[in-house]
Curated annotation (Swiss-Prot):
Residue numbers binding Zn(2+) 1: 152, 155, 205, 208
Identification of the protein by name: Chaperone protein DnaJ
Similarity section: Belongs to the DnaJ family.
Gene Ontology BP terms: chaperone cofactor-dependent protein refolding; DNA replication; protein refolding; response to heat
A GO cellular component entry from the record: cytoplasm
Cofactor: binding comment: Binds 2 Zn(2+) ions per monomer.
Gene: dnaJ
Keywords from the named record: Chaperone, Cytoplasm, DNA replication, Metal-binding, Repeat, Stress response, Zinc, Zinc-finger
Length: 380
């Protein structure tokens, strides 16, 4: 029997986003999961079909091959295939993490059911940091203060008020999970009384309210690498929220935001700046000082430089955090028009303008070209 189109299997269009594909798969997996349909061969086949479609369309390379060649591009039994297909349910828990763990009683890393309290990885934390362009370019070491959980000094981490005890949950008898019948099938879910801990605290600690920990602040050392760009994140492993029931802690992600600079604009590893010069320097040329992140450099402006001209200073940008190569600095020329002139200065400019126009296109090539275009426009 010919295979159905993977997009048709998931019920999405060929232009569906990764998020839409994932949502469609989750919906079908929930509907046809074997735990919900224990005696249905049809449901099992539909589940496998949906899983195979998701494995192909969620992988960029496999999806590209399928879009171009169809099933021939990904079938291991055909030339050019990627060699992937639906084989059992091994990738199911990995694809969904703990989303189905609470529904079907599966631990976060496998399908063991009814085996006591589950361990969960702690949540990741995000810390937003604003730095200057100079700090981003050169890198530096700094300290940040982030929320942190400490052991409660009142109950010493037990969660129970001193003098009382922690008891085995009377609902799940320490298993952390209970069986619930819904219609024609039975599911395992997290115990609603102990929330999967398997323990029950009749008299919670008055300070930490049964958590066994209290929130505080922790100082961390953070190394900002040279060349870091807007929106990049630095991971500090193990400094997120603590795990549950002995699970590993999450990570802390420091998200970098760069302040606007008064002189430079950044474009990747390149820098841009506007450089005002006088009319005289633009006409006759001359040396000017150009600012860079490493200090001032001397640049020779060629004579006859026009407004809007851009000069490129190689290697005067930012050394990329990934590439290791320095970008360039682009200097955009802005010719300043003199203001608040004296009468003597005005007269000198009139004489200069007259002498320039007597030379025609020899002195003002752009103006002469524009005048020629206007004449042609009105004479046509």
């Amino acid at each position: 029997m010919a295979k159905r189109d993977y997009y048709e299997v998931l019920g999405v269009g060929k232009n569906a986003s990764d998020d839409e594909i994932k949502k469609a798969y989750r919906k079908l997996a929930m509907k046809y999961h074997p735990d919900r349909n224990p005696d249905s061969k049809e449901a099992e086949e539909k589940f496998k079909e949906a899983k195979e479609a998701y494995e192909m369309l969620s992988d960029a390379d496999k999806k590209a091959a399928y879009d171009q060649y169809g099933h021939a591009g990904v079938d291991p039994n055909m030339a050019g295939g990627f060699g992937a297909g639906a084989q059992g349910f091994g990738g199911f828990a990995e694809a969904f993490g703990d989303i189905f763990g609470d529904i079907f009683g599966q631990a976060q890393q496998g399908g063991r059911r009814g085996a006591g309290p589950q361990m969960y990885r702690g949540a990741d934390l995000r810390y937003s940091m604003e730095i200057t362009l100079e700090q981003a370019a050169h890198g530096y070491d700094t300290q940040i203060r982030v929320p942190h959980w400490d052991e409660c000094d009142h109950c010493h981490g037990k969660g129970a008020e001193p003098g009382s005890s922690v008891e085995t949950c009377p609902t799940c008898h320490g298993a952390g999970q209970v069986r619930v019948s819904q219609g024609f099938f039975t599911m395992q879910q997290t115990c609603p009384k102990c929330h999967g801990n398997g323990k029950y605290i009749p008299k919670p600690c008055s300070k930490c309210h049964g958590q066994g920990k209290v929130k505080s602040q922790k100082t961390l050392e953070v190394k900002i690498p040279a060349g870091i760009d807007e929106g990049m994140r630095i991971r500090s492993s193990g400094n997120g929220e603590p795990g549950i029931n002995g699970g590993p802690p999450g990570d802390l992600y420091v998200e970098i935001h760069i302040k606007a600079h008064s002189v430079f604009e950044r474009d990747g590893d390149d820098l841009h700046c506007q450089m005002p010069i006088s009319f005289a320097v633009a006409a006759m040329g001359g040396d000017i000082e150009v600012p860079t992140l490493g200090g001032r450099v001397t640049f020779n402006v060629p004579e006859g430089t026009q407004a809007g001209k851009t000069f490129r200073l190689r290697g005067k940008g930012i050394k990329g955090v990934r590439s290791g190569y320095a970008g360039d600095l682009y200097v955009h020329v802005v010719i300043e028009t003199p203001v608040r002139l004296t009468e003597h200065q005005r007269e000198l400019l009139r004489q200069f303008d007259k002498s320039v126009h007597e030379g025609g296109s020899r002195h003002s090539p752009q103006e002469q070209s524009w005048l020629d275009k206007v004449k042609n426009f009105f004479s046509s």
